[in-house]
């Protein structure tokens, strides 16, 4: 049961009432307002506060910024058929007018605006349980900090706004360091208060927990090379003793794995409420439009766990490759996936709107058996933080601090030895440099298409890995009979002096006279 439906119409109605405009209204509101609701009347009860905080959750990362964000890195390709600005980012052709980055910027700042409204008004409520109101306050503070973490990771320098603004107010850009310090301070205050519970009952699944605050602190710390903070926060999550790896890697991203003990924080979709097309990002043969395509960069990250077969490059690969990617020869629905140029199926590589361009298709997040009768009713939650990530952050922090001990190997090997994965363990005796490479590769193998690859490449200063010829699937060329790698001559660029920080959107520059554009971009 999943009752925190963060995209339902009532949530957006709250936003429309108090921020001057609606972000879009779904059908089927929980209430029918009979007239305008005054601010004085609204901030009266505990239920008012809960609805307002629910509105803050509404701006959490969705399928776009979880699945699609990996499509602008070395491991993926975001189809240009309906949102060409995503592909522009992938190719290194980014500018302040890019619609993709503008949309992400606006969503995070909507969340911040809503959180600021909660924090400015919640103390006015007299009719409510003090403990519940304190928890709701902590939730709003956490979500605001989460949005600022994302903004600082993508744009680096952004305005820090902590109170409701008048329409004419303008705020200058704050440095990335100021934003990061604010986020860590906020998370520390929330963690130290112990207001957030370790878990919730079924009526409140999806709300922020104490563990989520600790895990988010580890994430913001490791993104900014604060390895001692990251180590300690990750260890604190581990020591809670309430999280564990879900046995089925593939099942974790399907209906069976929802709300499992591996999930620390996610964007919830409610049964009978807000949904999305569960097949939409995947193959044409099951009704998808190949929105995000895995690329050769991902294939190359997965190890061979048995002899490499020159007659079949897919044989003996890490099982997570099979769980994450549809490639020719794999079952798909009631058929066999075949995207080779000679295929007579809808999945044949093509420049059409629905077919894959480079040959591979996304399998992660696709739950065929559950949604085969109506994929539009997909309600698989978008996992934002999970325990495997915490283990890898712990291991990486210890490696960077040169505190290499058995616990580092244990953390990595727990993931590699997950039932249904069971790839060989990493044996002890590795150097710091060797372990650094191991944990970085393990992150992409484990966390592919969970919206983390771009952040990892940026914090490691490895943006150049996105550079070069875009390469898709292995296939047998009909004329030569040899295995080939598909490409169309598309080349991605990366400017290390500019592209680690996205440009402030042009729309923002046009209305804010005191904001400063990031270096390297012209308006």
Feature map (PLM): residue ranges:
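Conserved, well-structured interaction surfaces
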Residues: 45-54, 58-64, 84-155, 169-178, ...
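C-terminal substrate/ligand-recognition segments
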Residues: 325-415
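An aromatic- and glycine-enriched ligand-binding surface/loop that stacks and positions planar moieties
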Residues: 22-84, 180, 188-189, 193-194, ...
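Long, intrinsically disordered, low-complexity segments
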Residues: 21-23, 65, 83, 95, ...
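Bacterial Sec-dependent N-terminal signal peptides
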Residues: 1-33
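Alpha-helical solenoid repeat scaffolds, predominantly canonical TPR units
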Residues: 114, 179, 186, 233, ...
């Amino acid at each position: 049961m999943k009752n925190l439906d963060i995209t339902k119409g009532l949530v957006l109605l709250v936003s429309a009432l108090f921020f001057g405009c609606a972000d879009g209204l779904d059908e089927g509101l929980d209430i029918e307002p009979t007239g305008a609701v005054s601010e004085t009347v609204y901030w009266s009860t505990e239920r008012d506060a809960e609805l307002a905080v629910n509105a803050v959750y509404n701006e959490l990362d969705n399928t776009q910024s979880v699945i699609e964000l990996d499509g602008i890195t070395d491991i993926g390709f975001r189809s240009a058929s309906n949102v060409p600005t995503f592909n522009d980012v992938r190719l290194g052709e980014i500018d302040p007018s890019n619609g993709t980055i503008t949309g992400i910027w606006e969503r995070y700042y909507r969340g911040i605006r809503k959180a600021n409204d909660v924090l400015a008004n919640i103390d006015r409520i007299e009719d409510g349980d003090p403990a519940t109101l304190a928890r709701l306050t902590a939730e709003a503070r956490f979500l605001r900090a989460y949005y600022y973490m994302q903004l600082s990771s993508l744009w680096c320098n952004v305005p820090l706004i902590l109170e409701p603004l008048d329409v004419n107010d303008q705020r200058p850009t704050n440095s990335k360091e100021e934003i990061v310090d604010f986020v860590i301070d906020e998370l520390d205050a929330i963690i130290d208060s112990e207001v957030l519970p370790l878990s919730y009952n079924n009526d409140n699944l999806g709300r922020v927990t104490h563990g989520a605050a600790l895990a988010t602190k580890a994430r913001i710390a490791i993104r900014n090379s604060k390895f001692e903070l990251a180590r300690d926060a990750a260890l604190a999550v581990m020591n809670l003793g309430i999280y564990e790896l879900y046995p089925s890697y593939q099942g974790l991203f399907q209906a069976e794995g929802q709300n499992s003990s591996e999930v620390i924080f996610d964007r919830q979709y409610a049964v009978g409420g807000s949904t999305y097309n569960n097949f939409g990002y995947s193959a044409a043969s099951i009704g998808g439009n190949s929105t995000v395509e895995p690329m050769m960069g991902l294939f190359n990250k997965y190890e061979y766990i048995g002899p490499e077969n020159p007659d079949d490059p897919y044989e003996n690969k890490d099982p997570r490759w099979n769980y994450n990617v549809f490639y020719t020869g794999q079952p798909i629905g009631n058929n066999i996936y075949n995207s080779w140029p000679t295929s007579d199926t809808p999945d044949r590589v093509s420049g059409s709107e629905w077919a894959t361009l480079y040959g591979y298709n996304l399998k992660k997040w696709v739950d065929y058996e559950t949604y085969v009768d109506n994929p539009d009713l997909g309600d698989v939650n978008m996992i934002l933080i999970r325990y495997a990530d915490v283990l890898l952050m712990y291991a990486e922090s210890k490696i960077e601090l040169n505190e290499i001990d058995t616990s580092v190997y244990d953390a990595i090997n727990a993931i590699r030895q997950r039932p249904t994965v069971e790839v060989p363990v990493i044996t002890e005796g590795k150097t710091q440099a060797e372990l650094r490479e191991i944990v970085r590769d393990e992150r992409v193998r484990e966390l592919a298409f969970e919206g983390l690859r771009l952040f990892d490449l940026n914090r490691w200063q490895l943006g150049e890995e996105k550079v070069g010829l875009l390469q898709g699937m292995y296939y047998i060329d009909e004329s030569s009979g040899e295995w080939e790698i598909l490409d169309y001559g598309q080349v991605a660029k990366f400017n290390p002096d500019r592209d680690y920080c996205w440009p402030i959107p042009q729309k923002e520059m046009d209305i804010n006279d005191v904001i400063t554009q990031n270096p390297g971009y012209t308006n």
